[in-house]
């Protein structure tokens, strides 16, 4: 086992864990300030460029970086590191189970979001565990499963740009079209297919408070699992995604 605290936010609020979970991943875990009551878990899945063994890579962009830049989120943030290859849903669940066993977690509020390789991981994880994932957001990715009938149970928002040269927008199209062909269609799906958006642009969504507010609108206690209304994601809105963030302050507590 190896763990250390990050510099940049208070000690013990962000800790890296290595070799902690058998058949799992090394991971960062951010702990919110108030932990006397059960808190949601937000799982962030990174893209291929952050794969490896250097765990500080995972802090380069995404939800952990957003927290370090001042975005306060009233939830545990779980950010595993993939050493390489596709994300494995079973390994992710092993890590999540460790968090649930060792912290006060609200199991009705488990959220996952990721981009590129992490977008694939998000789709595959939600497809595998639709009864565990409360809501999900997948950016510029796709999916590796053959069937998506279980995915239609999950409130899901997919974002992909038509100018993506790393992962073709057709990969998201395949998932969306497969979901729509399932019995009952895809009533819990939002799909933003954005003209002219590049591969890297959706990374800015991780820094928007609206991203987490949208996730927190969902809870497994809602038997209908109604999908919350969208907020606006466009090339224009993403340009101002960092407008209220600073690495030197914490602002805008987002409550579940």
Give the predicted meaning of each segment.
Residues 132-142:
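A conserved short beta-strand
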Residues 34-37, 86-116:
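Gly/Ser-rich "nucleophile elbow"/oxyanion-hole loop immediately N-terminal to the catalytic nucleophile
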Residues 112-114, 139, 159:
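Short beta-strand immediately N-terminal to the catalytic nucleophile in serine-hydrolase-like folds
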Residues 39-41, 45-92:
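Active-site machinery of serine-nucleophile hydrolases
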Residues 63, 162-190:
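Active-site-adjacent alpha-helix of alpha/beta-hydrolase-fold enzymes
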Residues 7-41, 75, 120, 125-128, ...:
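A domain-start/cap signature at the N-terminus of enzymes
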Residues 77, 161, 191-201:
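Histidine-bearing beta->alpha loop at or near hydrolase active sites
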Residues 152, 157-160, 164:
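Short beta-strand/loop motif that positions the catalytic acidic residue
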